[in-house]
A protein has these predicted regions:
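Surface-exposed molecular-recognition determinants
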Residues: 1-261
């Protein structure tokens, strides 16, 4: 990093969350637009670059399994970060840099779910900006490493939702879908113990909050706070959760336990 205050300001404390792609890139012509792809099938993530067309198109992702989450951004444009999430389906989108509720439009994903080889984009600039290079970060579930889903908030009326992931999460992001609220992120490094897991917000530049929202457990996470952004009564909350490392292979059948805490 250089000396810029966004990444290395004097006396400031920073956090970085990193996902490993492949050691290099490869051309991928599985879709209607040829893309440049760095794919790591072990961890279930790929980075995809293509030239936006502004019209319906398919893009190869290199994972060999349909991604559960696709995050898109126009590199040269000011359009929003588009988020496809499997729990929302192929007609809806969220925007990572905004607080708004889920949006519905055929122009986002052309009402088409990702396949084992491609994801589909429509004409909206957030997903396929005409004349601009686009980037996408694709994630598929890996047993005992990553989980993408939703839960329903209870405002602590039932003690707070427990979300089973099958592993101890190292990083969690949550977004309410039916109303305006923040993208809330937690990790096991900044504080690193329950009940003091402080949130940061993907859509904001503010410092971390001191709210104690959840406990990170050996097999998932437990919501501990009556907060609109993560526990509105009756509201759907989508989440992404990752463990420290993808320890299992497809033949392990989930047999390796997470470390208890």
């Amino acid at each position: 990093v250089n000396t810029d205050g966004e990444v290395n300001g004097s006396s400031d404390t920073y956090v970085a969350w990193n996902w490993l792609g492949a050691n290099g890139t490869a051309s991928n012509s599985n879709g209607s637009i040829t893309a440049t792809v760095s794919a790591n099938t072990t961890s279930g993530c790929s980075i995809v670059k293509w030239s936006g067309s502004g019209s319906n198109a398919t893009i190869g992702h290199g994972l060999g399994v349909a991604p559960s989450v696709v995050i898109t951004k126009s590199i040269g444009g000011s359009s929003a970060w588009g988020v496809y999430h499997i729990s929302l389906g192929n007609t809806k989108i969220l925007f990572l840099n905004e607080t708004g509720a889920v949006g519905t439009n055929v122009a986002y994903w052309n009402n088409t779910s990702p396949t084992s080889s491609v994801f589909t984009v429509g004409s909206d600039a957030a997903v396929n900006h005409s004349g601009n290079d686009m980037i996408a970060y694709c994630f598929t579930e890996i047993t005992n490493y990553s989980k993408f889903g939703f839960y329903v908030g209870d405002a602590l009326n039932k003690g707070g939702p427990f979300v089973y992931t099958g592993f101890r999460p190292a990083w969690i992001m949550i977004k309410r879908t039916d109303g305006a609220d923040t993208w809330t992120m937690y990790d096991n490094k900044r504080i690193g113990y329950n009940v003091d897991n402080n949130p940061l917000f993907a859509n904001a530049t503010t410092t971390e909050s001191t709210d104690d929202d959840l406990d990170i457990l050996s097999n998932g996470f437990k919501i501990k706070r009556n907060s609109g952004r993560i526990n509105t009564d009756g509201a759907n909350m989508v989440y992404m959760a990752f463990a420290e490392n993808p320890f299992v292979t497809s033949t392990d059948n989930g047999s390796i336990p997470a470390t208890a805490r």
